[in-house]
């Protein structure tokens, strides 16, 4: 299975990191798909805060076992446009989940949030 996790308020949470590790341990391909701007984009604009912010994302990705080439920065675009050929995507944003359900019939969008 090809599985994707949003980062902020999703894979940044310890319990979801454990879930991602379980998918990896079971042999599934796990990605991070985030609306964040890429480090390269931040560097080109001179926005050092993006570089610092993404260091935390890379740290968590390494901890979980997700290589850098399996991290997709959508640069603010709707995530569904980056999730063709994915089976499941976990996100805390209900609008992103709705867009996945509307546009990607073969991808299951799962809403993850704390009440």
What annotation goes with each model-predicted range?
Residues 15-23, 82, 96-103:
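A short acidic, amphipathic alpha-helical/loop segment
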Residues 21, 66-67, 80, 106-109:
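Generic alpha-helical hydrophobic packing signal
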Residues 28, 69, 87, 106-108:
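A structural micro-motif
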Residues 71-95, 100:
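Conserved Lys-Pro-Asp/Glu-containing loop-to-beta segment of HAD-superfamily phosphomonoesterases
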Residues 93-115:
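Asp-based, Mg2+/Mn2+-dependent phosphohydrolase catalytic module
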């Amino acid at each position: 299975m090809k599985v994707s996790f949003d980062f902020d308020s999703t894979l940044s949470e310890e319990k979801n990191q454990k879930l991602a590790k379980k998918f990896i341990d079971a042999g599934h391909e796990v990605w991070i798909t985030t609306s964040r701007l890429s480090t390269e984009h931040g560097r080109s604009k001179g926005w050092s805060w993006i570089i610092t912010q993404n260091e935390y994302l890379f740290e968590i990705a390494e901890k979980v076992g997700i290589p850098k080439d399996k991290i997709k920065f959508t640069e603010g675009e709707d995530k569904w446009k980056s999730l063709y050929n994915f089976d499941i995507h976990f996100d805390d944003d209900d609008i992103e989940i709705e867009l996945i359900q509307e546009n990607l019939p073969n991808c299951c969008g799962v809403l993850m949030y704390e009440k």
